[in-house]
Amino acid sequence: MSKLLKLFSIVAAFALILVGCSSTTNSGASNSGNKTKIVTSVNFYAEVAKSIAGDKAEVSSIISSTSVDPHDFEPTAQDAKNVADANIAILNGGGYDSWFEKLTANSKDIKKIDGAKLLGLKDGENEHIWYNPEVMSKVADELTKVLSEKDSSNKDFYEKNRDNYKKELSKITDKINSLKDKANGKYVLTTEPVFEYAVDSLGCKTTDQVKKLAQATEEGNDPAPQDLKTIQEQIKSKQISLIVNNVQTTNKTIEDLISLAEQNKVPVLNVTETQPDGKTYIEWMLEQYNKLEEILNGGSGEKAYHVEGAEEGHSHDHGHEGHSHEGHNHDHKDHDDEKEHKH
């Protein structure tokens, strides 16, 4: 009799698990209720999701610390579970967060919103799309569409939140547009491709040698000697009128070029690849553009610096097989207790 009771208990427990799994899959609900669960690879996409979904969804980001580099992040079992439990995933795409793409590939029922695909990014193109002023607006539109399809009774709520968020986003595009007259046609040296979308949107230019330098820095390589010599001459002659310095990646060549720029009074704008702790995406972008405005208005620029842990570039595979990225501090033991970069 006891064996039968034990067998019955096991079968009943297993049945309850199956029923629970089935109800979660069919309803699209998370374990904590009927709210849609949204997971993002990095924090600035979580910000979009929270702004639009409000209290109608649970939103979480796998990476929320400045000190973590998304290129070669290694997700934990808990990260995999969080993705598996989600209904919607927002990723950067373009190979930037390939580990997240792999996690979402294992979840058949998850709806994916891929920023790179929304922009029509091709393989091998610059994956730092959050500096493209269009991307957040496109993600907001797509998320609103997906949420409205899943939860049609709150469609007006999502659309109103989207409109409010896009109104805030317009502060960035308004700022960019206000700078175009003074920025247009100026030659800029970007130490790495991070800021290139912003450079394009401002109407600035980069020489062929600078483009090769930025790519070499990103891949952890040295530029060709002749290219380096040409860049040095472009700085001395002030053909290059601005240095855009990614503070999270450096090498000896970059340090020397920045020193040369300072000697020749070519101003420096410091930018970051990842969203600084304690700032929203919009605050982060506006802060950098405001500093650029000061330079364009005749300011001397900033003192160049590099954060603790900034090393000699990083190698990128722009496909979807992951990245090796040495320009940041990588301690993934605890996402919330990461050692922070100094900003």
Residue ranges of each PLM-predicted region?
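Extracytoplasmic metal-acquisition and chelation regions
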Residues: 3-10, 17-343
